[in-house]
């Protein structure tokens, strides 16, 4: 992480916005809890695209980034046909990828969900855990933070 001039830390963030489709809800018209993982993944993919190191680039560089930890706090139910905004923020990237998420109602900005995911770096050639993120990734992050 790189502090800026006022000694605060800069982060890279991206948003994914959509309207909840019918096939994501249960009989009560509330989003089934398992779909939250999908929503986080969609926002994470946009964030990684912004960085220039998406899952295809990861594989091409010889690394895998499996999820090793995930936490979701369901603050308020998400409903069928509700417009939502999923915000993903990269908060750690030197030794692992830690991304924090906030899901809000797009219209009222009410907080509906908070979450985070942690991804470890694994060498694809031998499935060994790496102690640092690849230099190609950290260079791209640092370039965006300038």
How would you name each of these model-derived features?
Residues 2-6, 10, 14-16, 79-80, ...:
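HotDog/MaoC-like acyl-thioester-processing domains
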Residues 2-47:
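Catalytic strand-loop segment that frames the active site of acyl-thioester-processing enzymes
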Residues 18-21, 27, 54, 61, ...:
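Glycine-rich, flexible loop/turn motifs
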Residues 31, 65-67, 112:
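A broad, structural micro-motif
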Residues 47-85, 89-97:
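Hydrophobic beta-strand-centered segment that forms part of the acyl-chain substrate-binding groove
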């Amino acid at each position: 992480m790189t502090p800026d001039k006022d000694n605060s830390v800069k982060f890279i963030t991206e948003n994914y916005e959509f309207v909840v489709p019918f096939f994501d809800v249960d009989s009560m018209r509330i989003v089934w809890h398992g779909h939250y993982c999908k929503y986080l993944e969609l926002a994470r993919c946009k964030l990684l695209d912004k960085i220039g190191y998406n899952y295809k680039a990861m594989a091409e560089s010889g690394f895998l980034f499996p999820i090793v930890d995930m936490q979701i706090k369901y603050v308020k139910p998400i409903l069928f046909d509700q417009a939502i905004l999923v915000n993903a923020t990269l908060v750690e990237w030197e030794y692992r990828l830690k991304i924090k998420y906030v899901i809000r109602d797009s219209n009222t900005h009410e907080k509906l969900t908070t979450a985070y995911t942690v991804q470890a770096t694994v060498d694809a050639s031998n499935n060994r855990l790496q102690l640092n993120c690849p230099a190609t990734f950290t260079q791209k992050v640092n370039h965006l933070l300038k």
